[in-house]
């Protein structure tokens, strides 16, 4: 499962870990993504999305129908 939100487009960010002796090593911060199933009434079926926790709040605010329309407008297949 890739760490990529289908709703917000959030991806991992990159940076450095700094130890006590100030040695820097590369690391990445993954977004908190989860696979969730949502029922889409207009299609009469459930869809599975990989969403971040912020994406879940967007779905609660805008509704699953509007979010699915935005994802399809970007060209992603669901």
Curated annotation (Swiss-Prot):
One of its GO terms (biological process) is translation. GO terms for cellular component: ribonucleoprotein complex; ribosome. The keyword Ribonucleoprotein applies. Residues 1-29 are annotated as: Disordered. GO terms for molecular function: structural constituent of ribosome. InterPro entries: Ribosomal_bL28, Ribosomal_bL28/bL31-like_sf, Ribosomal_bL28_bact-type, Ribosomal_bL28_sf. Keywords: Ribonucleoprotein, Ribosomal protein. Belongs to the bacterial ribosomal protein bL28 family. NCBIfam families: L28 (TIGR00009). PANTHER family: 39S RIBOSOMAL PROTEIN L28, MITOCHONDRIAL, LARGE RIBOSOMAL SUBUNIT PROTEIN BL28M. This is Large ribosomal subunit protein bL28. The lineage of its organism: Bacteria, Bacillati, Actinomycetota, Actinomycetes, Mycobacteriales. The gene is rpmB.
């Amino acid at each position: 499962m890739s760490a990529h939100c289908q709703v917000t487009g959030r991806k991992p960010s990159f940076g450095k870990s700094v130890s006590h002796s100030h040695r820097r090593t590369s690391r990445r911060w993954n977004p908190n993504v989860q696979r969730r199933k949502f029922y889409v009434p207009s299609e009469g079926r459930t869809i599975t999305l990989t969403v971040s926790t912020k994406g879940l709040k967007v779905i609660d605010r805008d509704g699953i129908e509007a979010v699915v329309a935005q994802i399809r407008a970007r060209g992603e297949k669901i």
